Amino acid sequence: MSQLPGLSRETRESIAMYHLRVPQTEEELERYYQFRWEMLRKPLHQPKGSERDAWDAMAHHQMVVDEQGNLVAVGRLYINADNEASIRFMAVHPDVQDKGLGTLMAMTLESVARQEGVKRVTCSAREDAVEFFAKLGFVNQGEITTPTTTPIRHFLMIKPVATLDDILHRGDWCAQLQQAWYEHIPLSEKMGVRIQQYTGQKFITTMPETGNQNPHHTLFAGSLFSLATLTGWGLIWLMLRERHLGGTIILADAHIRYSKPISGKPHAVADLGALSGDLDRLARGRKARVQMQVEIFGDETPGAVFEGTYIVLPAKPFGPYEEGGNEEE
């Protein structure tokens, strides 16, 4: 079991005999849902089936088992189209409460949310769980209306997600680039496109699975094409900054080859070694043509290669970079 940095030494020691696991097999999923019903719905005299909802198929699920393989805790994270994650169906068996398993589950789900690039995590906490979530940094927004079939008061809890400051090279430029995408290409924000890394040599982007899947639960080709296009565009933009050049970047031609359907968390990688063209033409007031190759992965497995031809038009002197300018820092 991997350690989460926010857990105290005492908590890590108390949960050492337990193991986090994503339910995957049919048997594991059946046990997972049975546990949800027994812990959360059966005490309220609600029928089997009430422990499931329509979002389960697209959500992230976690469970904790002991050394004998007995299921002792569960939790679910669902990410909506507005880059907001919701924790639901979280439960710990009464026999193992106060051992840090609830904290482990909540922090694991929050870590998944952070990796997906969400802006905040919410939960509908039962009245007796409000204090627990408050200790984890969630802020109580007040009581919410619940169905009459749920005779327990619930409260909306919200926690902003701190972004990971792990960009190795020019994180300030990456922040400007991502903000420019969101402002000028609103679809990129709706898709949840996020810059994951820039090293000066490689540029990596990602997006959540949720909202970018097709009916077959693999990634939608249109979303992957858009992600690859922005990734190639972004590396060219960063190269212009590195060389103190400016220019308006236009995609002139592109095609994509799929080796297999892509599933899992996607990311796109553009490398300077897969780029050809002469950007120095811009310094002479002439347009430049750049060929770029972008690899697309799902769960670390390559699935497609995008090849694009971009035209970079000379910038107007001292215009903003987003419009192709060449202003100095």
From Swiss-Prot:
Gene Ontology MF: a single term: acyltransferase activity, transferring groups other than amino-acyl groups
Pathway: Lipid metabolism; fatty acid biosynthesis
Keywords: Acyltransferase, Lipid metabolism, Transferase
CDD domains: NAT_SF (cd04301)
One Pfam family linked to the record: Acetyltransf_1
EC number: 2.3.1.-
Signal peptide: none
InterPro entries membership: Acyl_CoA_acyltransferase, GNAT_dom, GNPNAT1-like, HotDog_dom_sf, YiiD_C
Superkingdom assignment: Bacteria
SUPFAM superfamilies assigned to the protein according to its UniProt record, in alphabetical order: Acyl-CoA N-acyltransferases (Nat) (SSF55729), Thioesterase/thiol ester dehydrase-isomerase (SSF54637)
Disruption phenotype: Deletion mutant does not exhibit any growth defect. Combined inactivation of FabH and FabY results in growth arrest, possibly due to the loss of fatty acid biosynthesis.
Induction: In the absence of FabH, expression is positively regulated by the stringent response factors (p)ppGpp and DksA.
Gene Ontology biological process terms from the UniProt entry: fatty acid biosynthetic process
Family statement: Belongs to the acetyltransferase family. FabY subfamily.
Function per UniProt: Supports initiation of fatty acid biosynthesis in the absence of FabH.
Extra facts: Overexpression rescues altered fatty acid profile, growth defect and reduced cell size of the fabH deletion mutant.
Protein name, UniProt field: Probable acyltransferase FabY
Source organism of the structure: Escherichia coli (strain K12)
Phylogenetic classification of the source organism: Bacteria, Pseudomonadati, Pseudomonadota, Gammaproteobacteria, Enterobacterales
Gene responsible for this protein: fabY
